[in-house]
Amino acid sequence: MAPTQGPRAPLEFGGPLGAAALLLLLPATMFHLLLAARSGPARLLGPPASLPGLEVLWSPRALLLWLAWLGLQAALYLLPARKVAEGQELKDKSRLRYPINGFQALVLTALLVGLGMSAGLPLGALPEMLLPLAFVATLTAFIFSLFLYMKAQVAPVSALAPGGNSGNPIYDFFLGRELNPRICFFDFKYFCELRPGLIGWVLINLALLMKEAELRGSPSLAMWLVNGFQLLYVGDALWHEEAVLTTMDITHDGFGFMLAFGDMAWVPFTYSLQAQFLLHHPQPLGLPMASVICLINATGYYIFRGANSQKNTFRKNPSDPRVAGLETISTATGRKLLVSGWWGMVRHPNYLGDLIMALAWSLPCGVSHLLPYFYLLYFTALLVHREARDERQCLQKYGLAWQEYCRRVPYRIMPYIY
């Protein structure tokens, strides 16, 4: 019998019907984007040029490659870490421990790929396998999510997430029942959050760059920019891996299909969309425009990193000279809310930086197609939705102090606009 956890959290994502729709819509959207990027018209909207059959999607070679990739990243996860960090306090007052070695995994992966390429590894062949790889990644996500759902049936009540325990199997399968599913000290959610998907994303980008060099003699400036910008983003996330321990994904959401599919399939195969588009639809880009795009990305990164670093520094040590002079609002929980610095400009300055960078990643693809701007459109919707979830949780947690913060900082993401 499944454990219960008392009062159930309000349903999100449209409840069971919304969850059922997203179970189908998310994979369908991913495959549409993969097909559209390689088609002649490259249309974001409308049917793809051709729908592949199972003989195109299913490949034992792709399955072996995908399982080998997961195995490699799991092995790198188990290597000694430069640091072991404690997570947030759980319902039973305990704290889980997490290895901080994601950046180490990125570097070792890069070294292994470099050695493989020097030995003749045909990395440029990877773009031709994106469809079957995406198919086996999706299949893996469904099977893995079923395992997580079954595992949660015997988990103690204290291990369950605030949401994902509605009693509806489809909704709970989608959202995830258990907060931190583990076997021994291997944390499945933490592993998937930043490892196979993010590192896989930059590897796919590199393969697309290599393929363009094979086809056209050298990679285009636009391809270099997309690869460089997104490598910086992934490297930053893995270098500051410890910060993920305070995010909603880790502290609030259960681990179900939503995060499993997102981490393992959606991220590597849709976030690489700009590089996929450039391989099949090369775009001219001059140095003046490239310089402007670099400036836009640098501005977004400066805001993103500055806001996150300020928040993380304040959480670790409010007396740190870098944040000691910032104005705060006291809360009933004992924690303080920053109301100056980056967090006095808007309530989510890190989201603002994220969106500016998303624009910079799309601009090298030109303005003749909407498809490369899918990430910007999707990420805007995602962050607006996440911001609304943040607002509800913070209001519930901090009460009047949060209302005062919202009065002092009226704009949510973009100053004077939203």
Curated annotation (Swiss-Prot):
Q: Which GO molecular function entries does the Swiss-Prot or TrEMBL record give? A: Delta14-sterol reductase activity; NADP binding
Q: Which residues form the signal peptide?
A: none
EC number from the UniProt entry: 1.3.1.70
Free-text tissue specificity from the UniProt record: Expressed in adult heart, brain, pancreas, lung, liver, skeletal muscle, kidney, ovary, prostate, testis and adrenal gland, but not detected in placenta, spleen, thymus, small intestine, colon (mucosal lining), or peripheral blood leukocytes.
Q: What is an example of a Pfam family matching this protein?
A: ERG4_ERG24
Which InterPro entries does UniProt cross-reference here?
ERG24_DHCR-like, Sterol_reductase_CS
Where in or outside the cell?
Microsome membrane; Endoplasmic reticulum membrane
Residues given in the record as NADP(+) binding sites: K311, R315, L338, W343, N350, Y351, D390, C394, L395, Q396, K397, Y398, Y405
Taxonomic superkingdom: Eukaryota
How is this protein positioned relative to the membrane?
A: Multi-pass membrane protein
Q: Tell me which GO cellular component terms the UniProt record holds.
A: endoplasmic reticulum; endoplasmic reticulum membrane; intracellular membrane-bounded organelle; nuclear inner membrane; plasma membrane; receptor complex
What are the GO BP annotations of this UniProt entry? cholesterol biosynthetic process
Pathway in which this enzyme or protein is active: Steroid biosynthesis; cholesterol biosynthesis
Q: Which Gene3D superfamilies match?
A: 1.20.120.1630
Inducing or repressing factors: By sterol starvation.
Reactions that this protein is recorded to catalyse: 4,4-dimethyl-5alpha-cholesta-8,24-dien-3beta-ol + NADP(+) = 4,4-dimethyl-5alpha-cholesta-8,14,24-trien-3beta-ol + NADPH + H(+); 5alpha-cholest-8,14-dien-3beta-ol + NADPH + H(+) = 5alpha-cholest-8-en-3beta-ol + NADP(+); 4,4-dimethyl-8,14-cholestadien-3beta-ol + NADPH + H(+) = 4,4-dimethyl-5alpha-cholest-8-en-3beta-ol + NADP(+)
Q: Supply the name of the protein.
A: Delta(14)-sterol reductase TM7SF2
Q: Which gene is the coding source of this polypeptide chain?
A: TM7SF2
